[in-house]
Amino acid sequence: MNGIRDVVREEQPRERLLLEGAGSLSNRELLAVLLRTGSKEETVLKLSDKILHQFDGLRMLKDATLEELISIHGIGISKASQLMAAFELGRRMVRLEYQNRYSIRSPEDCAKYMMEEMRFLQQEHFVCLYLNTKNQVIHRQTIFIGSLNTSIVHPREVFKEAFRRAAASIICLHNHPSGDPTPSREDIAVTKRLVECGQIIGIEVLDHIIIGDHKFVSLKEKGHI
């Protein structure tokens, strides 16, 4: 009887959540709670397994489109919408933790502030953090999306927002979708150009952080600033 009870318990993730807390559930079980029901052909846990397999786990699932989700047999508009809403809430909660005038004292602080948001992006995003005199983030702006080079990253776009926000300094960041944050020659060239412009204008570019997968490189620490 105990064996049967254990099997039933494993097949009831919502009940496990209520008894043991959400932290005790696996990824497939949490997904099953969001989906609520399976299909005529398979249980909700089997459907969860299929989704995780399709997207190679959570890494790619978080950026799944509506079309990609409903292409999976057993997932309709309703289930796909529930999943996408849950993923977006998760992203917003991560941002909330750091939104209230987050202070940056080191490259590690900066990487921590943006890592979870940027490390899974499938295209390069060039982002600027605008700081006040206390090194607190007063604004964040995505300057452009695409491969980084000196012809695309124009200082005018970077510093225009700094003037609008009365920023004292800027930290630039961009991600490498490959997961490897090693700076390229273009990364270094863009950084030096922005630093030079900042010196002329009087708004210091403090650092340029390259985000990889759970790792980062500070161009200031590498001696390029």
UniProtKB/Swiss-Prot annotation:
Annotated residues for binding of Zn(2+): H174, H176, D187
Location of the motif JAMM motif: 174-187
Protein name: UPF0758 protein BCB4264_A4572
GO MF annotations, alphabetized: metal ion binding; metallopeptidase activity
UniProt KW Hydrolase keyword: yes
Recorded superkingdom: Bacteria
Keywords, ordered alphabetically: Hydrolase, Metal-binding, Metalloprotease, Protease, Zinc
Annotated organism of origin: Bacillus cereus (strain B4264)
Keyword Zinc: yes
Domain MPN: 103-225
One GO BP annotation of this record: proteolysis
Family: Belongs to the UPF0758 family.
Cited CDD domains: MPN_DUF2466 (cd08071)
Pfam families in the record: RadC (PF04002), UPF0758_N (PF20582)
